[in-house]
């Protein structure tokens, strides 16, 4: 049985990780443990690079907390221009898989608060009246009226980040370069 460390205690993220591992390895083939670790980036990362660094840093910190595990999973949501998205980083042994989620264009009323230094989740809570938006459907769930959720969008990206660990083509050695 695989021991999977989720570098988060957020239920929406842990549910997405559970769905992805169910799809790839099957129910009952792993156990997930959530740990609260620092991302090393601001609470609201801005830009793809900063957001990706946050996800990688979460994995690094989770590995330090639980080095005996088999998988470490980091998810970091960010803002780039007028879009929200997230990076998924998964490590297993000495390999890494990464994927970026789908993006959602945000309305100006939300972006205004973000430009003033507030987090997307806090802005969504004020506008929607839902205090724990980030732990439920997220901005995605609110704006799509539940057709998509934070969990469903992250699930898809996590499936892509898991590909290097189960697709045999990723295990094949690179062909050697021909002599010149």
From Swiss-Prot:
<dbReference type="InterPro" id="IPR050299">
    <property type="entry name" value="YjjX_NTPase"/>
</dbReference>
<keyword id="KW-0546">Nucleotide metabolism</keyword>
<dbReference type="GO" id="GO:0009117">
    <property type="term" value="P:nucleotide metabolic process"/>
</dbReference>
<keyword id="KW-0547">Nucleotide-binding</keyword>
<feature type="binding site">
    <location>
        <position position="38"/>
    </location>
    <ligand>
        <name>Mg(2+)</name>
    </ligand>
</feature>
<comment type="similarity">
    <text>Belongs to the YjjX NTPase family.</text>
</comment>
<protein>
    <recommendedName>
        <fullName>Inosine/xanthosine triphosphatase</fullName>
        <ecNumber>3.6.1.73</ecNumber>
    </recommendedName>
</protein>
<dbReference type="GO" id="GO:0017111">
    <property type="term" value="F:ribonucleoside triphosphate phosphatase activity"/>
</dbReference>
<feature type="binding site">
    <location>
        <begin position="8"/>
        <end position="13"/>
    </location>
    <ligand>
        <name>substrate</name>
    </ligand>
</feature>
<feature type="binding site">
    <location>
        <begin position="68"/>
        <end position="69"/>
    </location>
    <ligand>
        <name>substrate</name>
    </ligand>
</feature>
<feature type="binding site">
    <location>
        <position position="68"/>
    </location>
    <ligand>
        <name>Mg(2+)</name>
    </ligand>
</feature>
<keyword id="KW-0378">Hydrolase</keyword>
<keyword id="KW-0460">Magnesium</keyword>
<keyword id="KW-0464">Manganese</keyword>
<dbReference type="GO" id="GO:0103023">
    <property type="term" value="F:ITPase activity"/>
</dbReference>
<dbReference type="GO" id="GO:0046872">
    <property type="term" value="F:metal ion binding"/>
</dbReference>
<dbReference type="InterPro" id="IPR026533">
    <property type="entry name" value="NTPase/PRRC1"/>
</dbReference>
<comment type="function">
    <text>Phosphatase that hydrolyzes non-canonical purine nucleotides such as XTP and ITP to their respective diphosphate derivatives. Probably excludes non-canonical purines from DNA/RNA precursor pool, thus preventing their incorporation into DNA/RNA and avoiding chromosomal lesions.</text>
</comment>
<dbReference type="InterPro" id="IPR002786">
    <property type="entry name" value="Non_canon_purine_NTPase"/>
</dbReference>
<comment type="subunit">
    <text>Homodimer.</text>
</comment>
<keyword id="KW-0479">Metal-binding</keyword>
<dbReference type="Pfam" id="PF01931">
    <property type="entry name" value="NTPase_I-T"/>
</dbReference>
<dbReference type="InterPro" id="IPR029001">
    <property type="entry name" value="ITPase-like_fam"/>
</dbReference>
<dbReference type="GO" id="GO:0000166">
    <property type="term" value="F:nucleotide binding"/>
</dbReference>
<dbReference type="GO" id="GO:0006772">
    <property type="term" value="P:thiamine metabolic process"/>
</dbReference>
């Amino acid at each position: 049985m695989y021991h999977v460390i989720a570098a988060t205690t957020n239920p929406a993220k842990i549910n997405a990780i559970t769905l992805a591992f169910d799809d790839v390895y099957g129910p009952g083939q792993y156990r997930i443990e959530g740990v609260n670790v620092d991302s090393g980036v601001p609470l609201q990362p801005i830009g793809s690079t900063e957001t990706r660094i946050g996800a990688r840093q979460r994995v690094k910190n989770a590995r330090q907390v639980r080095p005996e595990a088999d998988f470490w999973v980091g998810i970091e949501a960010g803002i780039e221009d007028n879009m929200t998205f997230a990076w998924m980083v998964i490590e297993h042994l000495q390999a890494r898989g990464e994927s970026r989620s789908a993006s959602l264009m945000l309305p100006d009323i939300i972006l205004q608060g973000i430009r003033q230094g507030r987090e997307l989740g806090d802005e969504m809570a004020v506008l929607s009246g839902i205090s724990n938006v980030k732990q439920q459907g997220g901005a995605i769930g609110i704006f799509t009226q539940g057709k998509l959720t934070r969990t469903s969008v992250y699930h898809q990206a996590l499936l892509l980040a898991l590909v290097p660990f189960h697709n045999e083509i990723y295990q094949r050695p690179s062909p050697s370069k021909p002599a010149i």
